[in-house]
Amino acid sequence: MERIKELRDLMSQSRTREILTKTTVDHMAIIKKYTSGRQEKNPALRMKWMMAMKYPITADKRIMGMIPERNEQGQTLWSKTNDAGSDRVMVSPLAVTWWNRNGPTTSTIHYPKVYKTYFEKVERLKRGTFGPVHFRNQVKIRRRVDINPGHADLSAKEAQDVIMEVVFPNEVGARILTSESQLTITKEKREELQDCKIAPLMVAYMLERELVRKTRFLPVAGGTSSVYVEVLHLTQGTCWEQMYTPGGEVRNDDVDQSLIIAARNIVRRATVSADPLASLLEMCHSTQIGGIRMVDILRQNPTEEQAVDICKAAMGLRISSSFSFGGFTFKRTSGSSVKREEEVLTGNLQTLKLRVHEGYEEFTIVGRRATAILRKATRRLIQLIVSGRDEQSIAEAIIVAMVFSQEDCMIKAVRGDLNFVNRANQRLNPMHQLLRHFQKDAKVLFQNWGIEPIDNVMGMIGILPDMTPSTVMSMRGVRVSKMGVDEYSSTERVVVSIDRFLRVRDQRGNVLLSPEEVSEAQGTEKLTITYSSSMMWEINGPESVLINTYQWVIRNWETVKIQWSQDPTMLYNKMEFEPFQSLVPKAARGQYSGFVRTLFQQMRDVLGTFDTVQIIKLLPFAAAPPEQSRMQFSSLTVNVRGSGMRILVRGNSPVFNYNKATKRLTVLGKDAGALTEDPDEGTAGVESAVLRGFLILGKEDKRYGPALSINELSNLAKGEKANVLIGQGDVVLVMKRKRDSSILTDSQTATKRIRMAIN
């Protein structure tokens, strides 16, 4: 207070005021403060001071040929004196005015395209509605919010590659555009920006806004989606808020919202299945949101919500340290190990010094043509899920993983001495010795590995030592997945692990998330969510379960039929029949199942009693654990449309109606698909029987010579094409399959394609 009083006294004296306002500023400290460093200390003042000068702007000398020396009013537009310290010319602000009025004009067609985000923002604000202002205390929470509406979800690196490709296509530097979104955007933008005269750097900045999600940690009360965040300064102050309804939605907000709904539905469903973790993964892999695979969105989308994070944890999205082995990139996604030297003996009694990894670890293994997930313990492969383009690529990945596991049976499978050298003629380290050995010939390795019977997990099959697929046996711990094991990419801040009950833990073992944390809130998704997994059939109610079950049976009838006659138990255990059980009255499930299984057994025993329609109709009932009883049923009840409806064991009903004339099945009045006639019923033409192992390409093509008879087909080499005479004298072009795995579906496809080729 004393100081303030003293200052007031001083200021009241006119002499003090005069000194302060009139004296020149020549104190060294002050001069230093305003002149040291490149950073402008008082930009506003500097601007005012500069603009007060006659020629505050410098320009390239070429400007002298483009702008007259004086304007219409006779004012000088540029000075003949050079700018000190550069060879540029000094220019008056009036030159800018002249240029704007009289300078060259250019096409504006590219402006809305380049400045798309700004144009769209203006539209949203124009269409938006601002409501009343309320004065009240604002409770704000700092949240990480998306500040950039209308962006794609590319990572910074992906976006950088796209921008370089579009804006600076001739610059040197390796750029690999891998994702579908990258390629699509690049193509689109190249077309849009042809002959664009806007400065490339500006285009690059604007593209970045469109491609990358920008987040900030901001205090927010209320809406956090990007269309609200862009008007935060208009809608909430410290003590007031203004009601606002955005004038349009943007896809990135819709993706975030729909992702949360999908993740919640999936976690809720997985929690009640026998193996929650496997179920959750299967559902994430087979779900699409707005036409994009959910796993792809999870990988790129930083939304932090419990269910979403559980899904991410299940997919192994976390910080990873990657290394390369056998041409594959390994990223540890979980677990830890300590290294220890150990001496081991090969099958040839050669001693190898191995650095053994002790401990449980999980890895993603990513190569160009194959990918895998590996779970291993000390010198033991627990599980390997591989997917690849072809047999060869899958074999490569399996060899690499088996060697990496350091299992004893792998080391004992070595025949002969290991003495591989590198180009410099130096011996390779033991792990690479083993790798090279088995890459040359893995027969003994695969034979010695051991095989085991397998459960039927959707999307996965077994693989035998000779690399043929199987649905009943597989090399120990090894499975082949139809879906790629996706490359690991992550924005997560911590490493987490998840158990089969979907509990997510950090590295210290603290539980971070569990299904109990997942909100029960229901919402309507903005984008279409397509759940392909049978586990999600029930999300749209009992009718959907009924129709989906029968559609699945019809779609897979060729395989189902074979299993029905050869391995019914495996068929009854298919997860696709699980949802159906909830429709069958609990008390009747076991009795129905026992009855249907007995009926099926009689069909198998008594030749000629095979009835396709009846098998399809009753099959889902056989999936429940059967009760032995002598009960007979003429109809079976299912609970749909709020009451029990009957399916007649023999004959049609509103629930299950097969039209013999059209060969189409309707379930609850909805079309469930067509039944191709069955060879077992003696009615199918010779073509479907003959054309197994062949692909029908279309109508006859004279270039491939005269039509062969059906018997001459057997002489074709794999991949060879020929015309063939079928059925009633029609000729079609066929190709012998390169592999035999899909023979089952050939006869179905053949029948369809013959019809198309002939018509």
From Swiss-Prot:
Which GO biological-process labels does this protein carry?
A: 7-methylguanosine mRNA capping; cap snatching; DNA-templated transcription; symbiont-mediated suppression of host gene expression; symbiont-mediated suppression of host mRNA transcription via inhibition of RNA polymerase II activity; viral RNA genome replication
Could you give a GO molecular-function term held by this entry? RNA-directed RNA polymerase activity
Query: What residues correspond to the site Avian adaptation?
Result: E627
Tell me where the sequence motif Nuclear localization signal sits in this chain.
736-739
Instruction: Write out the annotated subcellular location.
Output: Virion; Host nucleus
Q: Print the keywords alphabetically.
A: Cap snatching, Eukaryotic host gene expression shutoff by virus, Eukaryotic host transcription shutoff by virus, Host gene expression shutoff by virus, Host nucleus, Host-virus interaction, Inhibition of host RNA polymerase II by virus, mRNA capping, mRNA processing, Viral transcription, Virion
The record, for InterPro entries, names:
Flu_PB2_2nd (IPR049110), Flu_PB2_6th (IPR049114), Flu_PB2_C (IPR049115), Flu_PB2_CAP-bd (IPR048298), Flu_PB2_middle (IPR049111), Flu_PB2_N (IPR049106), INV_PB2 (IPR001591), PB2_helical (IPR049113)
Keyword 4Fe-4S appears in the UniProt entry: no
| The keyword Translocase is assigned to this record | no
Q: Which domain of life is it from?
A: Viruses
A Pfam family (short name) is: Flu_PB2_6th
A cellular component term, taken from the record's GO annotations? host cell nucleus
Report the protein's function.
Plays an essential role in transcription initiation and cap-stealing mechanism, in which cellular capped pre-mRNAs are used to generate primers for viral transcription. Recognizes and binds the 7-methylguanosine-containing cap of the target pre-RNA which is subsequently cleaved after 10-13 nucleotides by the viral protein PA. Plays a role in the initiation of the viral genome replication and modulates the activity of the ribonucleoprotein (RNP) complex.
Family statement drawn from the similarity comment of this UniProt entry: Belongs to the influenza viruses PB2 family.
Q: How does it assemble?
A: Influenza RNA polymerase is composed of three subunits: PB1, PB2 and PA. Interacts (via N-terminus) with PB1 (via C-terminus). Interacts with nucleoprotein NP (via N-terminus).
The name on file for this protein is Polymerase basic protein 2
Origin organism lineage: Viruses, Riboviria, Orthornavirae, Negarnaviricota, Polyploviricotina
Instruction: From the UniProt record, report the name of the gene that encodes this protein.
Output: PB2
